[in-house]
């Protein structure tokens, strides 16, 4: 039997850092960067010790947006858990929904029972979400460097994607559309035409962002050689996503550990070899193009599966009524409500029971990982055989990746902290949860 070890980690706060600097007698300055600063990507606090304009020490302070999501899920049904998960990383919310539902389906043993159309719809919505998340990352990153045109184009194109999300799910954000067993609703009648037009628009306007970034001498000067983190650093700290692929390692869970039939889609893993901020931005630009390739294949598969089920047939999991919010802000049709609530007493009783009490999940635990917009997004669920999780945990890539910020910034200039942080693109809702 191995020996028990006790590991202690000592942090520090403002008073401690000031006292340490005073004892050393260094002519250094300790400054607070955030948490109320527009370049911290949310309520993040960086405690920076400066020797002139050089960063000699940097510590990351998080927890300002902690809302107890994981604990709250222990008091909600498995279906209601989606509503909490979608509010973690609110920029790339569909990935949270997907990884949670895949984990629940693995516990239920129904992974292979999810209809093909539901799997395609999941790929479609998450790849659109990947594009919109990268548009925010590149746009805000450019804005922080003074390139406001990049932000204008990014927000403009993201707005088109949000409008499509609203047409499909009824909401622009916090959708809770992906459910255990499939998706809540199918595409609207004009959904395929809207997706087709959206793909054409992305093909036309996404290269516009690349024109502002790829060969812009100011953008390159502010990002090349900045925030250096090589492969050994990323592996030691568990960094994934664009930051890891910027070291030249083609690690993408859609290829290495396929889910949702990603092994049947034709796309390439974007890599770079500079290990710096510029490489991470270039990878995001390339990944948006690859997502468009995947969306084209989704469009073809959605045309072939039109009219098929989008939820498992098991009545213990699927709701008898597809109660959902439409893009007009209204609910389902009167005919649909009449069928569930006025014609079948058994359907009404079953619907009431499965919505209020929920379904039971066999006892056990599971870990499911997918390739989110920022890296490996994992969900660890523990079930005691009841109608709600015994324990839930989310491995948010932003939480792990932001721990590499001191390694990137210490020894560099203060002005390089902002592009280094922007290249990681942490979303504090996911970091703090």
Curated annotation (Swiss-Prot):
Tell me the GO molecular function terms. NAD binding; NADH:ubiquinone reductase (non-electrogenic) activity; quinone binding
- Gene3D superfamilies in the record, alphabetically? Cytochrome-c3 Hydrogenase, chain B
Q: Record's InterPro entries?
A: NADH_Q_OxRdtase_suD, NADH_UbQ_OxRdtase_49kDa_CS, NDH1_su_D/H, NiFe-Hase_large
Under the heading HAMAP family, the entry gives:
NDH1_NuoD
Subunit record text: NDH-1 is composed of 14 different subunits. Subunits NuoB, C, D, E, F, and G constitute the peripheral sector of the complex.
Q: What does this protein do?
A: NDH-1 shuttles electrons from NADH, via FMN and iron-sulfur (Fe-S) centers, to quinones in the respiratory chain. The immediate electron acceptor for the enzyme in this species is believed to be a menaquinone. Couples the redox reaction to proton translocation (for every two electrons transferred, four hydrogen ions are translocated across the cytoplasmic membrane), and thus conserves the redox energy in a proton gradient.
Task: Quote the protein name from its UniProt record.
Answer: NADH-quinone oxidoreductase subunit D
């Amino acid at each position: 039997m191995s020996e028990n070890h006790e590991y202690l980690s000592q942090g520090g706060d403002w008073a401690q850092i000031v006292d340490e600097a005073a004892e050393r007698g260094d002519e250094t300055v300790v400054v607070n960067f955030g948490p109320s600063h527009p370049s911290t990507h949310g309520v993040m606090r960086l405690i920076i010790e400066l020797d002139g304009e050089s960063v000699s020490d940097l510590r990351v302070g998080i927890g300002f947006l902690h809302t107890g999501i994981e604990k709250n899920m222990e008091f909600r049904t498995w279906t209601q858990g989606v509503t909490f998960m979608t509010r973690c990383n609110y920029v790339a919310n569909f990935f949270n929904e997907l990884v949670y539902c895949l984990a629940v389906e693995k516990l239920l043993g129904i992974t292979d029972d999810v209809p093909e159309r539901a799997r395609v719809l999941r790929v479609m919505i998450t790849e659109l979400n990947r594009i919109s998340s990268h548009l925010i990352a590149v746009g805000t990153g450019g804005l922080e460097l003074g390139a406001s045109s990049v932000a204008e184009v990014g927000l403009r194109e993201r707005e088109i994607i949000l409008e499509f999300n609203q047409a499909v799910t009824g909401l622009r954000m916090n959708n809770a559309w992906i459910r255990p067993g499939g998706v809540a609703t199918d595409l609207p009648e004009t959904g395929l035409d809207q997706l087709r037009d959206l793909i054409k628009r992305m093909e036309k306007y996404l290269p516009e962002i690349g024109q502002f970034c790829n060969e812009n001498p100011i953008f390159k000067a502010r990002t090349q050689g900045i925030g250096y983190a090589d492969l050994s650093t990323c592996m030691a700290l568990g960094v994934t996503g664009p930051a890891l692929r910027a070291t030249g390692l083609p690690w993408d869970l859609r290829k290495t550990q396929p889910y949702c039939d990603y092994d049947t889609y034709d796309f390439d893993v974007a890599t770079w070899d500079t290990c710096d901020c510029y490489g991470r931005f270039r990878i995001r630009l390339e990944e948006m193009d690859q997502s468009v390739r995947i969306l084209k294949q989704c469009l073809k598969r959605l045309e072939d599966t039109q009219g098929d089920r989008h939820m498992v047939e098991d009545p213990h999991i699927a709701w008898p009524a597809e109660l959902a919010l439409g893009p007009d802000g209204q609910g389902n049709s009167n005919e649909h409500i009449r069928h569930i609530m006025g014609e079948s007493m058994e359907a009404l009783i079953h619907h009431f029971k499965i919505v209020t009490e929920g379904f039971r999940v066999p006892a056990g635990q599971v870990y499911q990982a997918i390739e989110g917009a920022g890296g490996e997004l994992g969900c660890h669920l523990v079930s005691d055989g009841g109608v709600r999780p015994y324990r839930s945990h989310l491995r948010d890539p932003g939480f792990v990746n932001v721990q590499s910020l001191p390694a990137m910034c210490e020894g560099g200039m203060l002005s390089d902290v902002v592009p280094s942080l922007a290249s990681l693109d942490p979303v504090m809702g996911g970091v703090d949860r």
